[in-house]
Design a protein with these regions (language model features):
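Serine-hydrolase catalytic machinery in alpha/beta-hydrolase-like enzymes
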Residues: 1-93, 97
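Alpha/beta-hydrolase-fold catalytic nucleophile elbow
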Residues: 44, 101, 125-128, 152, ...
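Primarily recognizes the serine-hydrolase "nucleophile elbow" in alpha/beta-hydrolase
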Residues: 96-144
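C-terminal catalytic histidine-bearing segment of alpha/beta-hydrolase fold enzymes
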Residues: 163-211
């Protein structure tokens, strides 16, 4: 957990979600690049991955495209939403200023959370992810808030190909998402440019200038 640079009664909260085979320490390395007003926490996925780390859901790599374990994804989504609420309470964060940022599987979970509970998030950033079709809303929302989503994807990504990003660009706006889509000449990674864009976008959701 990284506390805000200056004392704040109820700081905004950013929750970071790692990809498969990693753990909560992976994305926490990005914390120094993020707005100092943010209280930053990094969540660990609930399932053990092979050969190392943790996963939000298992993947059948023998399918084409690789098929996610939907039951595990649903269970992880419930755990994630509960974790966010617990973190807000535990750290006395501002419940109206909660941001999610995820990479790969973490990106898929972040967007799934935004679609499941759009009123709970000030914004969601997804880097190198894919949509989990089984977790998409059955129908477009009628009224209510449009959740801001930053989707970042590498055109050279060999793990989660750009086609998944293009699909998200097509499907998310009709589902009540205010989408900011950006692509980069990188692979399955967070590059220097995409990290700067992520940090700037998160700061913009808070409003005003970073401390």
């Amino acid at each position: 957990m990284r506390r805000p640079g200056a004392a704040s009664a109820r700081p905004p909260l950013a929750v970071l979600l790692h990809g498969i085979g990693a753990d909560e320490t992976d994305l926490f390395a990005l914390a120094p690049a993020l707005d100092p007003r943010l209280l930053v926490v990094s969540a660990r996925a609930p399932f053990e991955a092979e050969p190392m780390g943790y996963a939000w859901y298992a993947i059948d790599w023998y399918e084409h495209p690789p098929r996610p374990d939907v039951a595990q994804a649903r269970a992880s989504l419930e755990r994630l939403l509960a974790f966010v609420g617990e973190a807000v309470e535990a750290y006395d964060a501002d419940p109206s200023q909660v941001l999610l940022a995820g990479f790969s599987q973490g990106a898929s979970m972040a967007v799934s959370a935004a679609l499941a509970r759009p009123e709970a998030f000030l914004g969601v950033a997804a880097h190198s992810g894919r949509l989990l079709h089984a977790l998409l809303p059955a129908s477009p929302p009628h009224g209510g808030p449009r959740v801001p989503v930053l989707w970042q994807h590498g055109r050279l990504d060999p793990v989660v190909p750009m086609a998944f990003g293009d699909e998200a660009r097509r499907l998310l706006p009709p589902l009540g998402v205010d989408l900011d889509f950006r692509e980069y000449a990188i692979g399955h990674e967070i590059g220097a440019e995409s990290l700067r864009d992520l940090a700037t976008w998160l700061s913009g959701r808070l409003g005003g200038a970073g401390a």
